[in-house]
Amino acid sequence: FLLLKILLIICVMFLIFSFVYGIARTNDISMKPAIKDSDLVLYYRLDKNFVSGDVVVFKKNNRIMMSRVVAVAGDQVDITKDGLMINGAVQISQDIYSDTTQFKDGTDFPLTVGQGQVFVLGDNRTVASDSRIYGCLNINDIKGKAIAVIRTRGI
């Protein structure tokens, strides 16, 4: 009877982590300092209503990546000498320590985020691979919204 309970718990946990939640490990420093290299991120798969500030987990070029949503459908995004502008307003964040600049062979600005898309940037703007390179993300390509970070340094 105990074995049956254990098997049931394992099956329930498998279903929960297959369809409701997911865990991803970071492999870069694009989201530093919020998420550091080798941290584990618990994400929620079912919420597809993203807002500016959400950290999302997605797959791009066969790599699991994480970035912060900075613009949603209908928003106009521009990167100028003044920095990141959303709908004509300069965006300033206490958690971003470097300037937001365009990449030479990246996305053309200004752009308007399309329906069913979001524009994402890594917090570590100087090294992040984000929408400045590959454009807006389709919401269907996003695995989920980060809800917790588990630090693994020293483990």
Regions found by a protein language model. Name each.
Residues 1-65, 137-155:
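Protein maturation boundaries and topogenic segments
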Residues 48-86, 91:
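Extracytoplasmic/periplasmic/luminal assembly and interaction segments
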Residues 105-155:
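Beta-strand-rich cores of mature extracytoplasmic or soluble domains
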Residues 38-39, 54, 75, 117, ...:
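Structural motif
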Residues 87-105:
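PP2C/PPM family metal-dependent serine/threonine protein phosphatase catalytic domain
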Residues 30-31, 46, 67, 81, ...:
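Short, conserved secondary-structure segments in the cores of folded domains
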